[in-house]
Amino acid sequence: MGRGRLGFELLLGQVLEALPAAPATVVDAGGGTGQLAVALAGHGYRVTVVDTSAAMLATCAQRAADEGGEVAGRVTGVQGDAAGLPGLLGEGSQDAAVCHDLLTRVDDQAALLASLAGVLAEGGVLSLGFANRDWLALRAGRRGDHAGALRLVEGGDAITLNEAERLLAKAGLALVAASGVGVFAEAGDDDLNREERATLIELERQVAGREPYRSSARTLHLVARRGVFRPELPGDRL
């Protein structure tokens, strides 16, 4: 998604807030080179990265090793399809799951979410991140690609918050929080000075769960639970 260091810092903060306390078990579905997994391991989580690419998993292992023994010992790589997590790791075996940048890249989104639900223990937490179709449409339109914007407005591979909530419900996952990442932040913001960076981070944190800002964010971050009915949440969250 073109997320820079600052964007990752914002996302990581939201993920840590959503997850149960360490040393909970977490599966990172489609975790690739392990940027998020290793960061979570650094906070004490026991993370299993599932990815189809052996090369990606090798990079993940090296990234973990570079962080030292304790972190490396908390990261495990498993080569396989994220749509088959219960078979790979065991039904209900994980306290939490993270799945970022994968949902809109698979052919069968329902199968992926069913897999994530199946690997979670009852009440387990899912942190789900994906490119926001509304943001993509706005970006295309502002760049003068009105035909591209129209295609996105009418549908396409990317999805919206409401569409994601329906998919989650079908998988037996209740949406409990939704936030935006990258409302104002851009990849080039990594070069901001310390004061500007702190101001931007605080701005992003304050608007992440508020409309209309959330719906115009680059990335949507959804938190769901297995087997838990959605509560009535404050208006600034859902």
Q: What does each of the following model-derived ranges do?
A:
Residues 35, 39-85:
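Class I SAM-dependent methyltransferase SAM/SAH-binding core
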Residues 110-125:
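A short glycine-rich, Lys/Arg-flanked "PGG" loop and its adjoining helix->strand segment in the class I
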